[in-house]
């Protein structure tokens, strides 16, 4: 079986909820999966008891998956999936740079913007694909146990655009693993469309400490969410992003209504008093706004509140 002979390296860091979902599905469908995490308890639980995934896909414990805290064990894989938080992408890329990746593909899937730029600081990007997880919401319930609220589509594309044979191969692998996946000619469009949704909910949910549905059930919180998204949309328009929608407000509300119980990963980080992905999401709107001379008052305030709170528990 071609699936059984295919090696897949699933690379993710501590509290790797999304990486756990990905790895579980690939292993369940007979791919050879080795996960990397720096969290000893999570790795030990996976190796001793298997990886439990509960949620929209049911409740299943996958015993065929393996995990390690030793990055060098990931050598000689066909596919590396970087499912870390955005600020850890550079660290992973710096370690991958020591491997021979001439016949491998690196697929990086993050919230926000800037993953490709972080990777290219440490390694060439000709073998790097970009991915967007659409309609996913995941969290770690305990070591060895991941939960997910949604699972719509894995969208994948070449950094420089276009449809290629290798893109088709990777998309087919995701399909074989049980995901809905599709290759796109313009991945930047999709990254920006996901970015706008992240901006709409990550920051506001973290500031108000509410789920997406709770934000949408309050007109004042919804207004903050919408205005954050509109600021991001304006920047995308200036960057000539070819958006698939005109009505940004409707787009983000429709997106949110599909996962009302979800807590964005930024809120999960805030609640757990961990460093969050602010600089890649709402903070990125502020950064790009300064570069393009566009005022971003809603994202500026949201970012300042989250940053100020973060200083209280991260020294």
Regions of interest found by a model, annotated:
Residues 24, 28, 94-98, 121, ...:
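Short, well-ordered alpha-helices that flank and scaffold nucleotide-derived cofactor binding pockets
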Residues 10-59:
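NAD(P)+-binding Rossmann beta1-loop-alpha1 motif at the extreme N-terminus of oxidoreductases
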Residues 1-12:
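Single conserved hydrophobic/aromatic residue that forms the stacking wall/gate
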Residues 41, 87-88, 113-114, 162, ...:
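Short alpha-helical
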Residues 176, 224-315:
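NAD(P)-dependent Rossmann-like dehydrogenase/reductase catalytic/cofactor-binding core
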Residues 99, 122-127, 142-245:
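Internal alpha-helical scaffold of NAD(P)-dependent oxidoreductase catalytic cores
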